[in-house]
Amino acid sequence: MSENNGDNIELLSENDVARTIARIAHQIIEKTALDAPGTKPVLLLGIPSGGVPIASQIAQKIKEFTGVDVPVGSLDVTLYRDDLRKNPHRALQPTNLPLDGINGHHIILVDDVLYSGRTIRAALDALRDIGRPDIIQLAVLVDRGHRQLPIRADYVGKNLPTSRGEDVQVFIKEIDGRTAVVLTRGTEEA
């Protein structure tokens, strides 16, 4: 499970990530009653860039386990971030939503790593401008702690406590050519 390469430690291998995504899919199936009569339509919205392929993989697992097709979209939060002044030249990513919008839907935001909570706050602001879903939940592959806002995930693949001087990187095969979760050690912040 854990492979050390200098200052980089592989915390989750490709197989570990696949098992973790399957576990998240099972949690969503259990908590949402996807195909029960009268349930709100579920929509997985990945936050670019890491959350989008993870949302797709979760949807694939849900279909494999239940036969239910859960739609997947993406939600760009760039213009809603509170740190735009620090890095004003960010590339905008596409936002892809169902044609019928998000009103009345059960939205599950999907991201790769939950850290300060600021990205999720930006996602909530973006959703507010787009429509009014009935339920908004959060699924993350990794929760590394250090929240700056009162935000928690409803579905957590792996809790990986870190120091503030460390970084957790999620590599996804479709983007990076390999799948792994890696801890990079840095200097401890004062």
UniProtKB/Swiss-Prot annotation:
One BP term from GO: regulation of DNA-templated transcription
GO molecular function, one term: uracil phosphoribosyltransferase activity
Reaction it catalyzes: UMP + diphosphate = 5-phospho-alpha-D-ribose 1-diphosphate + uracil
This protein's UniProt keywords: Glycosyltransferase, Transcription, Transcription regulation, Transferase
CDD domains assigned: PRTases_typeI
Matches recorded under Gene3D superfamilies: 3.40.50.2020
Enzyme Commission number(s): 2.4.2.9
Motif PRPP-binding: chain residues: 107-119
This protein's record includes keyword Transferase: yes
InterPro entries linked to this entry: PRibTrfase_dom, PRTase-like, PyrR, PyrR_bifunctional
SUPFAM superfamilies: PRTase-like (SSF53271)
Top-level EC class as recorded in UniProt: transferase
Role description: Regulates the transcription of the pyrimidine nucleotide (pyr) operon in response to exogenous pyrimidines. Also displays a weak uracil phosphoribosyltransferase activity which is not physiologically significant.
Family to which this protein belongs: Belongs to the purine/pyrimidine phosphoribosyltransferase family. PyrR subfamily.
Name of this chain's protein: Bifunctional protein PyrR
Gene: pyrR
